[in-house]
Regions:
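Long, hydrophobic alpha-helical segments
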Residues: 58-80, 112
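Start (N-cap) of specific transmembrane helices in multi-pass transporter permeases
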Residues: 10, 14, 99-112, 116, ...
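A structural motif at transmembrane helix-loop-helix junctions in multipass membrane proteins
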Residues: 151-186, 192-201
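Transmembrane helix boundary and interhelical loop/hinge segments in multi-pass membrane proteins
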Residues: 71-91, 105
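Aromatic- and glycine-rich beta-strand/loop motifs that create alpha-glucan
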Residues: 1-25
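Secretory targeting signals
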Residues: 34-37, 46-48, 52-63, 107-168
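Terminal transmembrane helical anchor/hairpin motif
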Residues: 41-48, 183, 187-253, 257-261, ...
Length: 276
């Protein structure tokens, strides 16, 4: 346990030294406050509209940003150490590969987690301070759900980055694979499901299609945050289809957490067999 904590502390200190957490936090604050006040500018309105609209807009934006940030943070976690010669050095200590992987994941995982809490938490405080007649309980619940689910989404893609890093032999290969999986989960997956739905004229197994959304952590993330919001009544396409999923929110939370565990287990399985 001490070895895991030591590795985690080193990774966190490296992240703080590189100012990743500060940069991500500031980005999230600016985006959240900007969307809250200028999200409806296209319709000629400026100012805070509603909690539901703000969270819905933030969810759509975070679906693109958070996976990309997580992949950029961790794509070289294993292969980078190997190329630099430090991986072999680390493994000469009384430290198993599993301890090394878990320690690095915990340390690096704290960076986007703390940045998400600080960034979006500060935005929620700013909204509460500047908007009168606001239901603070609704604001707290909506942003808490959004922050926790954003952390889980980031961890899922960070675990995926560890799997890619354990598989790749060069950092450039890991970077290319990371970009590829980002395109797949954020853009291509939903487009393929929509194409399937259109090609079948809406007749492709209406019972099966909503369950296919569970194969993409970004779709699970969107369903967690948009289900129950007034903005959810205006959902179209696959998001509207996901509302017919016969599973409650607890199941969605569980599946998103399972994504993190399974991907991290696969990363360990590949790392344990990686030649050094």
């Amino acid at each position: 346990m001490n070895a895991i904590c030591s590795i985690a502390r080193k990774e966190l200190q490296d992240g703080l030294r590189n100012r990743w957490m500060l940069a991500i936090s500031l980005l999230f604050v600016v985006l959240a406050v900007g969307i809250a006040w200028f999200g409806a500018a296209a319709s000629g309105q400026v100012g805070f509209s509603s909690i539901d609209a703000t969270v819905a807009s933030l969810t759509s934006l975070a679906t693109f940003l958070i996976p990309l940030i997580a992949l950029l943070l961790a794509y070289d976690a294993i292969v980078g150490e190997d190329e630099g010669g430090t991986l072999l050095l680390l493994l000469t200590y009384p430290l198993s590969r599993g301890q090394l992987l878990l320690g690095k994941f915990l340390g690096q995982g704290l960076i986007p987690a703390l940045a998400t809490i600080l960034g979006f938490g500060a935005a929620a405080v700013a909204i509460a301070a500047m908007v009168s007649d606001l239901n603070l309980t609704v604001l707290f619940v909506a942003f808490s759900r959004f922050i926790v689910s954003s952390i889980l989404l980031g961890w899922a893609f960070m675990a995926l980055a560890y799997l890619l890093s354990a598989q790749a032999r060069e950092k450039s290969s890991a970077a290319g694979m990371a970009l590829g999986v980002w395109f797949w989960f954020v853009l291509v997956f939903d487009l393929l499901l929509l194409a399937l739905l259109v090609a079948s004229k809406g007749q492709f197994s209406p019972q099966l299609l909503p369950w296919l959304l569970l194969l993409n952590p970004t779709d699970i993330y969107r369903q967690i945050n948009l289900n129950g919001l007034n903005a959810g009544n205006e959902m179209t396409g696959l998001l509207a289809l996901g509302q017919s999923l016969p599973a409650d929110t607890l199941v969605l939370w569980s599946v998103l957490g399972l994504w993190v565990i399974l991907l991290l287990a696969l990363a360990y399985h590949r790392f344990a067999r990686r030649p050094i």
